[in-house]
């Protein structure tokens, strides 16, 4: 009897799942049908990337730049801002934190990227003109960091500590503060309103940028048994001195999220513009205050573009503002910046990434005029290995996290593969779980079971093998500008394989379609994801932090069902579960990230790929990420409005059957259709991407390219 009841229950669950699937199919089929009628039986033979514009340099050379860079330069060119008269402090005085906080407040109130860049540019210009020594802390406060990301020094203070600090600093009851926080969903706003009603007998001196930054740094560095009370005391000291909107942004900085829709790319553009418009000079004559008065419009525009592109380039090789800013403030010659700021061991760079393709034919079409190599695409964790003279080893993740303590076995085994004469290097490779008895690669899921923090050699249960595929630096010389064929040759000349510990990525240099197909099958049989295809000589330099069409990936899923590449998406909301999913979220609203507009665009509703246990765990994990209303930088349709909204905090890898145009979703809107976005058909959850931040999610531009590529693939 008990068995029959269990069988009946299982059958009911099965019927519920079938009903949910049918309902989902009907919904997406309707959306897909709508996309067919879109003025969209358009020929996608021509690739459509971000619009570019041709400009003429000072030397008379023609150069292509992104239209967004040109637009920002044009707006900066028309600014009437006076960095001294419009500042709120005098030369020689420290920068008031209020000046920065008020800029944040203005940015939060608008959404236009160019206007945001203009506001930031003006803020930086005043700091450069009046207090250049405060530019570094002001910059760190703006990007909400206190040190280079690879140093792992972060804020993100616990909610309970912040609540108590706000209550103690404002003299309010803790329960009242909690109630306000629950109602408003923004502890920064609660802190500000609490301070505005507080009366003090002896007002604290005004906060400065340096004071706030130094205090945040002390809080982040505070460790030990008494650290909680010490942190709380430091926070209270800041809050007691706050005026106007300062408390809002100090609390948000402590939470680790400014939440004003500001991306680091915009900060870099603003900084570049400020350095051109108000060059650092140590004095304030009119020419220094406003470079536009001594240059023609055309020349100024060229310098703004040059500074923007050069700053982005040097930061991609030296992502450390402590090193960069002194150079930028001292070196007036923009073209000289790269000579001072370049690839250096112990400073990791964001890796070069590949564009997805839908099959071998697309690869051949894109690389028809180039020689190229096919490599096994290993299913592991991307790693950048830095080896310093003297033998010190650093292991960094693709997100620039220092994973050296996670992989002590790599540091121990690597010297066995280093040939004589190799004294320093930076390797790009994949860490893969490996069975040394069978000498076979293990699935990524096995690797993910390894402990993430301080690991002892004797406690390791999942051995790993390092598969090296690129060499970025060797014996004091950067190889970034060398073609891939030369870098690969140096890699093989400088290292030797140690089976099961250190191996070279399997590769094949060919342009024969049958050879590529056979090699792809061989990769899949070896438990790999598919192939990486890379140009060998033409356009074959290594480009840090860029997803390039000179690297393409072909994954095994294409052989199974012709589906699209996976996407990395951010859950921004959820829908209450029904039936067997009562008590947990039944589905989630996912978004891609538009790095130009600095917004999250909804792309699909997902409820497939989760186990019951996972749904329960997710519901618990999102409990403290619920917000009362969507962010100003969430772009969505009222037709797909979730029951609850979340902070953008995590990234999920998702697969889908296809992509289609939809009036209910906003992903890539304006890139394929002016009125419709792109949605995923039959999305399913694959895994959580712990190595990615929300800003590293799939972009709207990438979604549009995947949609067009799918049309191209169907046509071939």
Name these PLM-found stretches.
Residues 622-681:
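C-terminal structured "cap/appendage" subdomains that terminate the fold
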Residues 1-512, 589-591, 595-609, 634-639, ...:
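N-terminal nucleic-acid-engaging modules of covalent nucleotidyltransferase systems
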Residues 491, 550, 559-560, 658-696, ...:
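C-terminal catalytic or substrate-handling cores of phosphate/nucleotide-
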Residues 380, 463, 528, 549, ...:
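Active-site lining segments that contact anionic ligands and/or coordinate catalytic metals
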Residues 386-388, 543-547, 565, 580-586, ...:
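Short glycine/proline-enriched turns and hinge-like loops at secondary-structure junctions
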Residues 495-543:
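Metal-assisted phosphate- and nucleotidyl-transfer catalytic regions
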Residues 352-374, 378, 513-519, 535-578:
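Flexible, glycine/threonine-enriched loop-and-boundary segments that flank and lead into catalytic domains
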Residues 395, 579-585, 598-605, 612-617, ...:
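Extended hydrophobic-aromatic, low-complexity segments
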């Amino acid at each position: 009897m008990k068995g029959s009841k269990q069988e009946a229950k299982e059958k009911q669950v099965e019927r519920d799942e079938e009903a949910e699937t049918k309902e989902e199919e009907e919904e997406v089929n309707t959306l897909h049908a709508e996309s067919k009628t879109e003025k969209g039986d358009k020929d996608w033979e021509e690739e459509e990337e971000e619009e570019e514009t041709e400009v003429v340099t000072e030397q008379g050379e023609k150069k292509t730049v992104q239209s967004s860079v040109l637009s920002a330069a044009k707006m900066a060119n028309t600014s009437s801002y006076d960095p001294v008269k419009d500042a709120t402090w005098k030369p020689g005085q420290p920068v008031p934190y209020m000046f920065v906080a008020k800029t944040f407040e203005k940015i939060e109130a608008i959404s236009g990227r160019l206007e945001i860049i203009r506001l930031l540019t003006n803020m930086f210009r005043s700091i450069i003109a009046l207090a250049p020594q405060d530019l570094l802390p002001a910059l760190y406060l703006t990007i909400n960091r206190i040190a280079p990301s690879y140093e792992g020094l972060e804020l993100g203070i616990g909610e309970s500590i912040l609540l108590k600090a706000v209550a103690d600093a404002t003299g309010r009851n803790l329960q009242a503060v909690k109630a306000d926080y629950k109602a408003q969903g923004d502890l920064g706003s609660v802190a500000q309103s609490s301070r505005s009603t507080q009366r003090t007998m002896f007002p604290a001196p005004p906060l400065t940028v340096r004071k706030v930054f130094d205090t945040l740094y002390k809080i982040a560095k505070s460790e030990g048994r008494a650290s909680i009370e010490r942190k709380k005391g430091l926070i209270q000291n800041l809050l007691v001195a706050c005026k106007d909107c300062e408390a809002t942004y100090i609390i948000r900085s402590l939470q680790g999220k400014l939440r004003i829709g500001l991306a680091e790319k915009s900060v870099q553009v603003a900084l570049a513009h400020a350095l051109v418009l108000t060059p650092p000079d140590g004095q304030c004559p009119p020419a220094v205050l406003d470079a536009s008065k001594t240059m023609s419009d055309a020349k100024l525009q060229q310098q703004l573009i040059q500074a923007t592109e050069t700053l982005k380039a040097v930061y991609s090789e030296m992502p450390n503002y402590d090193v960069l800013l002194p150079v930028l403030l001292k070196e007036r010659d923009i073209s000289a910046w790269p000579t001072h700021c370049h690839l250096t061991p112990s400073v990791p760079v964001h890796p070069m990434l590949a564009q997805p393709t839908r099959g071998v034919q697309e690869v051949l079409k894109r690389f028809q005029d180039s020689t190229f190599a096919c490599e096994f695409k290993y299913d592991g964790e991307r790693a950048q290995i830095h080896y310093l003279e003297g033998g010190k080893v650093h292991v960094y993740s693709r997100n620039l996290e220092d994973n050296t303590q996670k992989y002590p076995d790599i540091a121990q085994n690597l010297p066995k593969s280093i040939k004589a004469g190799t004294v320093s290097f930076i390797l790009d490779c994949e860490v893969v779980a490996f069975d040394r008895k069978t000498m076979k690669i293990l699935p990524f899921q096995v690797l993910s079971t390894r402990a993430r923090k301080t690991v002892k050699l004797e406690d390791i249960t999942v051995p790993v093998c390092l598969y090296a595929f690129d060499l970025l630096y060797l014996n004091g010389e950067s190889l970034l500008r060398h073609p891939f064929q030369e870098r690969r040759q140096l890699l093989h000349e400088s290292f030797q394989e140690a089976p099961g510990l250190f191996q070279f990525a399997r590769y094949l240099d060919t342009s024969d379609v049958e050879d590529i197909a056979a090699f792809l099958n061989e990769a899949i049989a070896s438990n790999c994801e598919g192939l990486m295809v890379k140009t060998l000589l033409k356009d074959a330099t290594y480009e840090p932090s860029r997803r390039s069409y000179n690297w393409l990936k072909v994954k095994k899923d294409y052989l199974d069902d012709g589906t699209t590449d996976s996407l990395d998406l951010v859950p921004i909301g959820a829908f209450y579960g029904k039936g067997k999913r009562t008590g947990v979220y039944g589905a989630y609203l996912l978004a891609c990230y538009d790095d130009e507009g600095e917004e999250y665009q909804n792309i699909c509703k997902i409820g497939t790929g989760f186990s019951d246990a996972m749904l329960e765990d997710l519901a618990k994990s999102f409990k403290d990420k619920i917000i009362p209303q969507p962010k100003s930088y969430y772009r969505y349709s009222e037709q797909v409005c979730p029951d609850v909204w979340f902070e953008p905090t995590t990234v999920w890898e998702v697969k889908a059957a296809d992509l289609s145009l939809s009036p209910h979703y906003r992903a890539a809107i304006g890139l394929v259709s002016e009125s419709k976005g792109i949605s995923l058909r039959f999305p399913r959850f694959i895994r959580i991407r712990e190595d990615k931040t929300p800003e590293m999610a799939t972009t709207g531009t990438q979604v549009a390219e995947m949609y067009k590529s799918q049309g191209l693939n169907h046509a071939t």
